Amino acid sequence: LPFAAATSTPVVQDKLKAKEVRELVDEYLELGGPEDAYEAEVLARRGEILAALDAVPPLKKSDRKKWIKRFGDRWDEWPKLEKSAGRTFLWPDAEPAQRRGKYVVGGDTGKPKGLLIAMHGGGVGSGDAEPMAAGYDGPAGKRDLLMIAPEVLEKTERGWTDSGTEEFVLELVERAIRTWDIDRDRVYFSGHSMGGYGSWTLGAHHADLLAGAAPSAGGPTPIMDIAGNFYDIVEGIVPNLRNLRVCCYQSADDPRVPPGPNRIATEKIEQATERWGGYDYEYWEVDGMGHAAPPGGYGDLLDKIVDARRNTRPERIVWQPTLDWKRDFYWVRWEEPRMLSVLVADLDRETNAVRIETGGRALTGFTVYLDEDMLDLDEEVAVVVNDEEVFRGILEPTL
């Protein structure tokens, strides 16, 4: 379990009885299904439960082991996917014309070592998971990856971020990990055309959950000037990718997705690297391939990222929130993230401190999660926000 250093004074709670603690934990774990896990009411209630659990005394080592086992046992009981290849639906019980949550399973369906989410192309009124599944099935299997190719819930220009599809993809990831006992540190996003947009965007929003992303012939949403020239991309992409392996494929003569947005994104990543350090990014541009798959097929693209593993404890986090329901990013939690602001959090091992910069803006409802691999928890730990020390003390493991 993590240690938590809160940057604001915790609310004093009455001491909870053991039964009350178990009931609160169970309620927290059971809150929200695949359609409402990120609703405001659910998130608010989870926040209330966490605040109430502040009253639980620091955990002894034996208590920590018991709680970890309890969490693991409960997580194993949650819904799983059908353990078979082929097409199915996350919500299969409706009439055939009303079924939602289509996805195709392929790749290594035996004992996969990782998970690939393959995102299809399309647009307004179009888009089908099955051609994308066919393209990634063999390459994923040869690389010991389970492949899941979801279909967007609504076929719009930005289908991967519209109408609950983003949450649907995250639910598939969780259920796949649980069903096949997949290494959580080997989850990859890739996709072609609009699926390239999806892997760029969802990859950035949830970089803390991934090992790598490989967009193909699709870019992040560009920003154009009055003359129609690309000069930037939308917020919430480049900063968040600092600790994620990314390879972006593009053909210079692509008539459907021109190279402008991906070239701009590459420039912005180069600038971000100079500013914040980090980044593990490759831009793979060729000519003469049009809107087709990369030379050598999707397998060659996957080879660019498949050996990467998720970095769960990066020395530096850069986070630009764009989703009000995304409260956790690596080892920080922000109850009410300020949209589009940029937060930089550093582990300063030399002074045994966490240093956070927000551009001078106030920071409230913020929690830092630490363990023995990050700082020396036998000594005092400091939390410094915008050069002001807001916490100093010996940390103890909390529920």
Each PLM stretch: what is its role?
Residues 7-114, 389:
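A domain-start/cap signature at the N-terminus of enzymes
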Residues 360-381:
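Surface-exposed beta-strand/loop patches in extracellular or lumenal glycoproteins
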Residues 107-111, 158-194, 204-210:
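Gly/Ser-rich "nucleophile elbow"/oxyanion-hole loop immediately N-terminal to the catalytic nucleophile
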Residues 124, 185-240:
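Primarily recognizes the serine-hydrolase "nucleophile elbow" in alpha/beta-hydrolase
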Residues 117-121, 217, 250, 356:
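The conserved beta1-alpha1 loop
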Residues 112-179:
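Active-site machinery of serine-nucleophile hydrolases
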Residues 9-10, 249, 255, 259-355, ...:
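C-terminal catalytic histidine-bearing segment of alpha/beta-hydrolase fold enzymes
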